[in-house]
Amino acid sequence: MAAATTTTTTSSSISFSTKPSPSSSKSPLPISRFSLPFSLNPNKSSSSSRRRGIKSSSPSSISAVLNTTTNVTTTPSPTKPTKPETFISRFAPDQPRKGADILVEALERQGVETVFAYPGGASMEIHQALTRSSSIRNVLPRHEQGGVFAAEGYARSSGKPGICIATSGPGATNLVSGLADALLDSVPLVAITGQVPRRMIGTDAFQETPIVEVTRSITKHNYLVMDVEDIPRIIEEAFFLATSGRPGPVLVDVPKDIQQQLAIPNWEQAMRLPGYMSRMPKPPEDSHLEQIVRLISESKKPVLYVGGGCLNSSDELGRFVELTGIPVASTLMGLGSYPCDDELSLHMLGMHGTVYANYAVEHSDLLLAFGVRFDDRVTGKLEAFASRAKIVHIDIDSAEIGKNKTPHVSVCGDVKLALQGMNKVLENRAEELKLDFGVWRNELNVQKQKFPLSFKTFGEAIPPQYAIKVLDELTDGKAIISTGVGQHQMWAAQFYNYKKPRQWLSSGGLGAMGFGLPAAIGASVANPDAIVVDIDGDGSFIMNVQELATIRVENLPVKVLLLNNQHLGMVMQWEDRFYKANRAHTFLGDPAQEDEIFPNMLLFAAACGIPAARVTKKADLREAIQTMLDTPGPYLLDVICPHQEHVLPMIPSGGTFNDVITEGDGRIKY
């Protein structure tokens, strides 16, 4: 075995929230999980006072539908600004048209430009209507899961809602992983599914699945449309729910006979969301924000713990850090909300976070948790997490406050508004406060020097960490990166220095393999001028490899950096550490020819007309990556990596900072 050399990379209770009171049982609650504030959609015209009963699925049966005209006089509808340009319909105002055409026009009125839709018997009418739209592009995935993940990539990279469409039965159920992923990672998504005709619902008709019931617990809300006249209101509500407050997925199930029925739409229907609107958190009170500033002034070792809830507040967060000098540790979902290469960045914390980020939390006396949910992959053993610190938790979702970790001070509200308010207080009191955490930062700098992110090189083998480091250098940290799930995902989080929000697209809460390639499709569609790279593992990549065909047909310049170690790397790492290296079905190659690369990923690319190359030696890697980046259009680079590599640092599940592992790999026994 070749001698190993080490390479190093250094990166620079008082609760003010109250639980919402239960809503009146007389009003339908079109939301089952969250009580949230909203942000207005500037693309929507104002509504009149006309109200229709909501058609929502019953908890007991998909065929039982609530059809009640609800009195909402006590809860005013939100006032929406008028669109700068009047929408011009291709239909005359009094011209009857199919429900499918009404649905497509409703999407157009929401400003939708792209959908990811795969046709089937129960959704054919929608696809026919899409062909009559001059403004909506359909990107045809090769699998419905690819479609929903692509819609997520579109939404995550742009901040706009992603739209996917599937047929009934298996088409709809193929969306399930994407809906669950969007819910856990707070991604705005509107999924539209075809359904069997109303008269067949509940009869076990061909390709009938009660998708509203199936997805009830993995969507922010869902609808079964039982009246064609409700389509304009339901679509407006779906987009509002998906994008307001804590974003999430909304599913709209449309029976085929509704799609075929002729009607004259009323575009002036008001949204009917009394329960949702009544549970909005109010803007943060100045007194609460001033108390947080006081806690900061009294602390000696504060640290910021920021998550996905800060992605829309990166400017305000940057100003807050500038005013306070507090170091920033990010969750996996929060990467990019603060530049990873800044001297005050501690990079990522948690199970595979940096030693110095976890050290900062362990030794802090004040933890400022903004837009986070205290996930188990971050906290480890809850009782030991930030045990010396006062905790301030700001989040838009009241359900997250105190769910896993009880804060000393909590504010349920928009992180952006809270940061703006605190920045104002800090600016006005700068001379009085004279914040100086230099001693604390020096202490953390010692930890950075002592425990930098590092990896070892063995002969000519290519360390996967090195491949990502080279990609970061050649793209100047400006590419949009998507990943699958596994070791490569963690290395991509560690060794690529994200400078801006929405550069990092990864399945965090659900951990869905197969996410990376279709997510890159969505990102490329939303950002046609950006460099989009799917950093993937061979296990994740092959789960949605069929989407190479979509990339080719749509002429998307998606690059794939495939870190191929022929194994399910993360599971194998746990086998090494906790199961005496007993291999339990984690080898993905051909057991009869273990020395051969199997399957040959280059042939998948060739079958879809995509240029591809393989690199096996470290000395050839930089040139190979540069060629990938310089080649117009899509490209696949198969990087053969040793399977013995481990993602380090590592805090075992349920462990504490004292359990952190910083050495070792699959080449030694445990």
Curated annotation (Swiss-Prot):
Pathway: Amino-acid biosynthesis; L-isoleucine biosynthesis; L-isoleucine from 2-oxobutanoate: step 1/4; Amino-acid biosynthesis; L-valine biosynthesis; L-valine from pyruvate: step 1/4. Its EC number is 2.2.1.6. It is an enzyme of class 2 (transferase). Changing M124I: No effect on catalytic activity. Increased resistance to imidazolinone herbicides. Mg(2+) binds at D538, N565, H567. It catalyses: 2 pyruvate + H(+) = (2S)-2-acetolactate + CO2. Introduced by genetic manipulation and expressed in sulfonylurea resistant plants. Pfam families: TPP_enzyme_C (PF02775), TPP_enzyme_M (PF00205), TPP_enzyme_N (PF02776). Residues 414-446 form a coiled coil. Disruption phenotype: Lethal when homozygous. GO terms for cellular component: chloroplast; chloroplast stroma. Chlorimuron-ethyl binds at K256, D376, R377, W574, S653. Residues 1-48, 55-77 have a biased composition (Low complexity). Thiamine diphosphate binds at residues 144, 207, 487-488, 511-513, 538-540, 565-570. FAD binds at residues 186, 246, 308, 331-332, 349-352, 371-375, 395-396, 414-415, 508-509. Its cofactor is Mg(2+); FAD; thiamine diphosphate. Homodimer or homotetramer. The acetolactate synthase complex contains both large catalytic subunits and small regulatory subunits. Homodimer. The acetolactate synthase complex contains 4 homodimers of the large catalytic subunits, and 1 homotetramer of the small regulatory subunits. Belongs to the TPP enzyme family. Catalyzes the formation of acetolactate from pyruvate, the first step in valine and isoleucine biosynthesis. This is Acetolactate synthase, chloroplastic. It comes from Arabidopsis thaliana (Mouse-ear cress). The lineage of its organism: Eukaryota, Viridiplantae, Streptophyta, Embryophyta, Tracheophyta.
